[in-house]
Amino acid sequence: TPKYLNSPESSIFEKGKLLFAFDKAYKSIREEKQAILVEGYMDVISAHNHGVTNVVASLGTAYTRDHGHILMRQAEEIVLAYDMDGAGRQAAARAIELLQNTDFKVRVLAMPDGKDPDDYVRNHGGQAFKELVAKAVKPLDYLLSESLIKHDTNDTEGKQAVMADVFPYIANIDSQTQRDDALKTLALPLWLDNSTIFRYFRDYVKKGQIELVD
């Protein structure tokens, strides 16, 4: 059973061009210069009921560039607070991709214990949720932590898998300085020196694949 049921799309109702509760949230978003983007209606309703009013939802669909256009005049920062199930993780990864190299500051909130924002707010309250949002991390840190959970970096295959997960994001960073900094960040948990990670990255950009030597 789908978690969120929406009306069929039409010329009037286009999910990719609407943000649930934006009419109620935009003043808070403007004041705080931050929009918290969640997946579902109940996430928004619970947050607003507990005093966190800069929260909007993408109506059960992934983030789109049209959503960004809606938020552009109100927010400087977008915090992604999607569910931590498979669909939520995929939606977060897609949103990170679309938000990369935009004017928004972007952070990602990994909900603890697999809970969604609705569960968390109802159990812990609005202030606790705000404190959690304050700890949201940069997209690179989120993608890296997600990958490190899945792969054992003590062996070559694990290192290669982590690089395969994170290199596409780094390759799309416009700034050379930021790209170099991202590679240095990636090198640390892989126990690689900077020159090695740079070489693997150059090979990835040139060949589209990663070839590691034990």
State where each predicted segment sits.
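Phosphate-handling DNA/RNA-contact segment within nucleic-acid enzymes
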Residues: 1-74, 78, 91-92
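A charged alpha-helical hairpin associated with nucleic-acid processing machineries
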Residues: 26-35, 62-78, 82-214
